[in-house]
Design a protein with these regions (language model features):
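Cytosolic regulatory modules rich in charged/polar residues
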Residues: 1-172
């Protein structure tokens, strides 16, 4: 394959070694093994050869010493921010009740939405869209709010911009 600048692209140069471990391996033993072999990831394999999960050395250390803040972590206290009146930037995992309290309206009180099945903003948008929306896609709520997908991967929504048109119209 090729990279954007036309140079040859070698995926082998990006591959990193990975440990394969059973779910029964004690944390301390796995941590020592990762340190000794200088490998930072382990794939947890079940008895049938299926994948139980992926662990990083950071995951293990956090189990011992507690949460470690790094440049990739988002402050959970700020699961959404008001950019301006009527416009919010929010993590998809923002609890729906918390966001509804902020904007003063119930987003699940509608025929198209099963209130029992939705806990987060991302879940609401997924339910409204009927699929995992792509970055840039705008999903409209039947009651007016618009959800623009700011960040997503093929499996999940990560960040949203929420616009409340009625609030924006009042300001215009």
């Amino acid at each position: 394959g090729f990279s954007a600048d036309g140079a040859a692209f070698d995926l082998r140069g990006m591959v990193r070694p990975l440990l394969f471990v059973p779910p029964s391996m004690p944390l301390g033993v796995l941590l020592q093994k990762m340190q000794a072999e200088r490998i930072h990831m382990a794939l947890v394999i079940d008895e049938y050869g299926g994948t139980d999960g992926l662990l990083t050395i950071e995951d293990l250390i956090e189990q011992v010493v507690g949460e470690i803040e790094d440049e990739h972590d988002v402050d959970e206290a700020d699961s959404f921010i008001r950019e301006k009146p009527g416009v919010y930037l929010a993590l998809a995992k923002t609890p729906l009740e918390e966001f509804e309290a902020e904007i003063g309206r119930n987003l699940t009180d509608h025929d198209e939405i099963d209130e029992e099945e939705v806990d987060t903003l991302g879940g609401l948008v997924f339910m409204l869209a009927g699929h995992v929306p792509a970055r840039g896609e705008v999903i409209r709520h039947p009651e007016g709010p618009e959800f623009e997908v700011i960040d997503a991967d093929p499996r999940r929504i990560k960040r949203l911009r929420v616009r409340l048109p009625d609030v924006l119209d009042q300001l215009a």
